[in-house]
Amino acid sequence: RNGNSDLLCNEFMRGAAEAGHQVEKIFLKDKHINYCTGCSVCSMYGKPCPQKDDAAEVVEKMIAADVIVMATPVYFYTMSAQMKTLIDRCCARYLEIKNKEFYFIIAAAEESVPMMERTIDGFRGSSTAWKSPKNAAPFMAWMPGKWAR
């Protein structure tokens, strides 16, 4: 909380709220989301994921949303483990995450646009599994006043 990705997310939310949109921020670190175990209950049998954690609640909100903003700091050249874990857990309902407009907010400690682009590539790769995604230009920042789109 209160890190660069959080501050950037706050600004995005402020603009969306001022434009009349309903917004909600979810801190993945406050959620209990287990790793996908590859049990195939969802993919082979079409049943809900058997894990009892907060993933179903977050994925349900993603399905209901028109716009999804995924914000993450860059940890060791990619998105945070919490973000990747959530994306993996979307597997059970990925066909329902359709026609969404995605925004990606990336914050890094060093000025390396190629490093941040690798993180964006991870998001874009995941979002191609979802039906008809509309990926907006990413927002990347590193030091105060230093950013790129």
Predicted segments with their positions:
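N-terminal beta1-alpha1-beta2 submodule of the flavodoxin-like/Rossmannoid cofactor-binding fold
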Residues: R1-A71, Y75-R93, K134
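Short histidine/acidic/glycine/proline-rich micro-motifs that form metal-
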Residues: R1-N2, V74-Y77, A109-V113, M143-W147
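Short, surface-exposed alpha-helical segments at coil->helix boundaries
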Residues: D6-N10, M116-D121
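Glycine-rich phosphate/pyrophosphate-binding loop and the adjoining helix
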Residues: M13, E18, D121, S127-R149
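Cofactor-binding loop segments of dinucleotide-utilizing enzymes, especially the Rossmann-like FAD-
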Residues: L28, I106-A109, A141
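Short glycine-rich or small-residue beta-strand-to-loop segments that form or flank ligand, phosphate
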Residues: V67-A71, Y103-A108
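Short, conserved loop/helix-junction motifs that constitute active-site signature segments
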Residues: R93-N99, W130
